């Protein structure tokens, strides 16, 4: 939403192992300026922001293969970006060099001007155009039943409630309809 008072609007649910210990959204005493949920097992986050306007989120990628437990937690990718000063695009391109050190992931990173997507299951990062994008446990904008349903719903909300879409987006996220597991 370039030129808008709120240029980036993210609506997300945490789709994780619920038994994994975590803290809800809050500021991090040990990393001033960072806000997000916190993975108490590995110390990172699945979604975070920094007071300087940086934002990042990571999802696991389902491959159908056994998880190999890479040497670093994917949640640390988010923290590394939030604490850095590289643009979203530069960070994504630099991360490609060691992206295979992690189990499958998608990363969305926002530097205040541009939104980048990177997956270690794809050939190269992308800077995203304005619009509605969906991300689950495959590549960006993959046509899965749940992401297709959300894309349609989010598009309707943004068209009907562009002045204040948050309440309607939260209502969409409350839908607990379970899609068939086709992937």
Located regions from the model:
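N-terminal nucleophile
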Residues: 1-183
């Amino acid at each position: 939403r370039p030129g808008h008072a709120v240029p980036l609007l993210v609506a997300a649910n945490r789709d994780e192992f619920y038994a994994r210990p975590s803290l809800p959204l809050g500021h991090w005493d040990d990393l001033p300026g960072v806000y997000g949920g916190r993975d108490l097992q590995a110390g990172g986050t699945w979604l975070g922001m920094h007071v300087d306007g940086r934002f990042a989120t990571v999802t696991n990628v389902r491959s159908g293969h056994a998880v190999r437990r890479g040497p670093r937690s994917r949640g640390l990718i988010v923290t590394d970006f939030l604490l850095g000063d590289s643009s979203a695009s530069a960070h994504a391109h630099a991360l490609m060099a060691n992206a295979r050190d992690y189990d499958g992931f998608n990363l969305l990173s926002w530097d205040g001007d541009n939104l980048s997507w990177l997956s270690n299951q794809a050939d190269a990062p992308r800077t995203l155009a304005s619009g509605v994008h969906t991300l689950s446990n495959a590549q960006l904008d993959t046509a899965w039943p749940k992401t297709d349903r959300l894309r349609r719903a989010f598009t309707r909300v943004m068209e009907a409630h562009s002045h204040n879409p948050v309440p309607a987006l939260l209502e969409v996220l409350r839908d607990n309809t379970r899609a068939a597991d086709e992937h």
